[in-house]
Amino acid sequence: MDLQKEIIENKEEFYNLAIEYYNNIDKKHRKECLITPKSISILIDHQFFTTPCVEIKLELIDQDYQKNIGHYFLYIDEKKDFVDEFLV
């Protein structure tokens, strides 16, 4: 299946995968917060990752102040295998 078509048809599955990976982060590095799906991108050329790969971005929101406190990025390959992740 075409990667773009698969993402469009199954975007909730991709976001849920990113949330699952975020929840596996060591608790001392993970904040209890509201998680909001932000974007899904296909990277076709990247300096560090084998491409094409998928970047899934989640927004992290402080529950008390309703304020953005960071972002979580998950990178997966076409088979949905883990490539990398960043918490900023």
Regions found by a protein language model. Name each.
Residues C33-L74:
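Exposed beta-strand-loop-beta-strand "reactive/processing" segments of non-cytosolic proteins
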Residues I69-V88:
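A short, surface-exposed interaction/processing loop segment used at functional sites
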Residues E12, H46-Q47, D84:
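Short non-domain terminal segments
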Residues M1-L43:
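Short, non-transmembrane alpha-helical segments in secretory-pathway proteins
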